[in-house]
């Protein structure tokens, strides 16, 4: 059967959802690995990554079941949810690519003071830095309580803000690029589901409704 027929659309939709399932399982696995090795101890970060992985896994399972059974209702809701995810993810990805360093610095500065002292100290040890941006009274207090390895050396410690900016700039570009790529795969998924949903199953009763 030529590609574009019922079997080809079904196989393409199944393959796409298998990829989504693998990505979802990968996110859950990475979060569990990071928690197990102590790479990330924040329960909010771990919970967020696992939630995204589970959500993606559920969408993929719904799409896969809908594709295998040619289930009209499941395919309809799959298209709606995937379309909404595309709009949200596309907007977030564009924002990640468009955000400048000044805005990043403001976000980092605001986030730093929300963190608990234990989380700040953990970040300082991980990135081998002390304090955030400027030599204010608060920074001096942070520097005094800092337990990073750089405190044992004669040279002054680098401020964490500059280190965070370097990492955040690179991370935002990667996240934005990956997000845009997955956004277009979601549009492909919506198109495949719509096409497949409107096709007639050759094994079904010819007089039955689509």
Curated annotation (Swiss-Prot):
Report TM segments: 13-33, 45-65, 73-93, 174-194
Where found in the cell?
Membrane
User: What keywords is this UniProt entry annotated with?
Assistant: Glycoprotein, Membrane, Transmembrane, Transmembrane helix
Provide Extracellular-side residue ranges: 34-44, 94-173
Fetch the InterPro entries from UniProt: Tetraspanin/Peripherin, Tetraspanin_animals
Glycan-modified residues: 109, 117, 134
Side Cytoplasmic, residues: 1-12, 66-72, 195-210
Q: How does it sit in the membrane?
A: Multi-pass membrane protein
GO cellular component terms attached to this protein's record: membrane
Similarity-based family: Belongs to the tetraspanin (TM4SF) family.
**What's the name of the protein?**
Tetraspanin-31
